[in-house]
């Protein structure tokens, strides 16, 4: 076991705080309408220019192990906010930095860290309740477009595109973002389906920057059985390898030797393959496999109807224009299925729904109709260069997540105003002792940090604007883009309630744990043993220092 370096008390906290501040300072320059870009160097290809907080956070690794621990914990805040709401990563980072800085000052002044954390937690619970009271529903296309615009860094065309996409496929519909071929953004609605099953192994991923699998014009094998023996798959794998197309396997499960062999073949480039579990359970799984078969013009390989996997041919495979697979969802875009077959299948499911006796069955049948008939909206992002394309695509994806969050839980006034109103609403909140009261003050002060950072990035004086907004009422705030005060909701400066709530909860959770840290342990760096000269044994003399 390697030797460890251990730091205690203030020594540990100072190092950790330095790491927190390095990461947060890099991320927070992107906040607000006048936030700046960050350029990320890549080991291959052009650098990436981004204004997305979580993309910046993920790139940062610090040389000092103790500082790096602090940075990694704040990175976790950004990642959690991103996973939960798809946006608000920079806000979460700014909140976490403020809570950690103020909290550690209080610890240095002699406050009890555990009581401080309890005070912070109390304040956050009360703040979330107040946020819910401030929230207004977001249902009309104009509000949806405004949320998309704000999240895409005030790009109105993106907001309008997302609103149009939601209008065409419904608020629960499937919307994907891909790189276009021209300079203009485009919206395309195609036949498609999404189900909640992701890839069975991360080794299938072929887009590591987004952690997804993208297959162009794949064959789709549908099997109503568990696949554990690779031998029964060999004939079809050989046929697919000869065709040069990728293969998507949708089966009850793929496990053991079969999964391992598929992974190895994929990694070696022998055949581009991905496996996912079939959606649903029991009879519903059989029905959904049949839905996918009709959508992709394939055949479900099932022993119940006398079809065996060993005898499957390319004619039994379904096909689609494109398949996108994340760790928890699969989207089939533009299956080659016959329109009349899809329509008759939809009519058949509708009839079953009308005859269903339970609400649960009706709901599940309605879901199947939506998947088959709803289609998929594809937003094609246009840009002049590859670098701009990647940056813009990331912004559009952020905006899409924010818009979905807004539809789900409503919106609050943007520009950091909602958090200032919430901090004011809980000003009379008291803890069980004085240290908890300090914790509540730390959380309330942190709630002003996003507005202050937006103002700092816009070149304004944060304290003056924060005081003016605090003395205002309702949704009155400061528009950093136009440098005017006004009603944020009426001005279309909206934040999804879910995004603001998630940012606050995750920031407080991890910052609270950091404040209560008393000891940090890390491995000591290995010292390079000095070269003994005279070359290596075995005739490799003179090559000792070369890699």
UniProtKB/Swiss-Prot annotation:
Mind listing the UniProt keywords for this protein, alphabetically?
A: ATP-binding, Chaperone, Cytoplasm, Isomerase, Nucleotide-binding
Any one biological process term the GO annotation gives: protein refolding
GO MF, one term, reads: ATP-dependent protein folding chaperone
Protein residues bound to ATP: 30-33, 51, 87-91, 415, 479-481, 495
Q: What's its EC?
A: 5.6.1.7
Q: Which GO terms describe its cellular component?
A: cytoplasm
The primary site where this protein sits is cytoplasm
Q: Which NCBIfam families match?
A: GroEL, PRK00013.1, PRK12849.1, PRK12850.1, PRK12851.1
The protein's name is: Chaperonin GroEL
Which PANTHER family did the record assign? 60 KDA HEAT SHOCK PROTEIN, MITOCHONDRIAL
Instruction: Say which family it is in.
Output: Belongs to the chaperonin (HSP60) family.
């Amino acid at each position: 076991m390697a030797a460890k370096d251990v730091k205690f008390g203030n020594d540990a906290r100072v190092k950790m705080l330095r790491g927190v501040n390095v990461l947060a300072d890099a991320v927070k320059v992107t906040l607000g309408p006048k936030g700046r870009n960050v350029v990320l160097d890549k080991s291959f290809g052009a650098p990436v220019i981004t204004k997305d907080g979580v993309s910046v956070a993920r790139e940062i690794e610090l040389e000092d192990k103790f500082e790096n621990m602090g940075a990694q914990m704040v990175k976790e805040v950004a990642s959690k906010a991103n996973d939960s709401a798809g946006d608000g990563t920079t806000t979460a980072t700014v909140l976490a930095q403020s809570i950690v800085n103020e909290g550690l000052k209080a610890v240095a002044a002699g406050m009890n860290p555990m009581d401080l954390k309890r005070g912070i937690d109390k304040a956050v619970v009360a703040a979330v309740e107040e946020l819910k009271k401030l929230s207004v529903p977001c249902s009309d296309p104009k509000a949806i477009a405004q949320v998309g615009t704000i999240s895409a860094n005030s790009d109105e065309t993106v907001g309008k595109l997302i609103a149009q996409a939601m209008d065409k496929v419904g608020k629960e519909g499937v919307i994907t973002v891909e790189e276009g071929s021209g300079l203009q953004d485009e919206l395309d609605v195609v036949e498609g389906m999404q189900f909640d099953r992701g890839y069975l192994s991360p080794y299938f991923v072929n887009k590591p920057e987004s952690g997804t699998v993208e297959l162009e014009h794949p064959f789709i094998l549908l099997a109503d059985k568990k696949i554990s023996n690779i031998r029964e798959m060999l004939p079809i794998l050989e046929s697919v390898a000869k065709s040069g197309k990728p293969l998507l396997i949708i089966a009850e499960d793929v496990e053991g030797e079969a999964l391992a062999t598929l992974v190895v073949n994929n990694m070696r480039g022998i055949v581009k393959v991905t496996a996912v579990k079939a959606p649903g359970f029991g009879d519903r799984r059989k029905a959904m496999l049949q839905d996918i078969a009709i959508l992709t013009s394939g055949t479900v390989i099932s022993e119940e109807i006398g079809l065996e996997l060993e005898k499957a041919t390319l004619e039994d495979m379904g096909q689609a224009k494109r398949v996108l697979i994340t760790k928890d969802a699969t989207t089939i875009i533009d299956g080659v299925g016959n329109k009349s077959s899809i329509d008759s299948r939809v009519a058949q499911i509708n009839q079953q729904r009308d005859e269903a006796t339970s609400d649960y069955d009706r709901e599940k049948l309605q879901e199947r109709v939506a998947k088959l008939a709803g289609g998929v909206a594809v937003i094609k992002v246009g840009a002049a260069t590859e670098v701009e394309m990647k940056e813009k695509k990331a912004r559009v994806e952020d905006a899409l997540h924010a818009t979905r969050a807004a539809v789900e839980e409503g919106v609050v006034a943007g520009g950091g105003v909602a958090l200032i109103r919430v901090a004011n609403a809980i000003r009379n909140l008291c803890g069980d002792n004085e240290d908890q009261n300090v914790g509540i003050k730390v959380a309330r002060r942190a709630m002003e940090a996003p507005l202050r950072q937006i103002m700092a990035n816009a070149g304004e004086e944060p304290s003056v604007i924060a005081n003016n907004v605090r003395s205002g009422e309702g949704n009155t705030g400061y528009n950093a883009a136009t440098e005017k005060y006004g009603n944020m909701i009426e001005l279309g400066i909206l934040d999804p309630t879910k995004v603001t709530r998630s940012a606050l909860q995750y920031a407080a959770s991890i910052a609270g744990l950091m404040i209560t840290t008393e000891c940090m342990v890390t491995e000591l760096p290995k010292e390079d043993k000095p070269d003994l000269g005279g070359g290596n044994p075995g005739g490799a003399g003179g090559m000792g220092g070369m890699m």
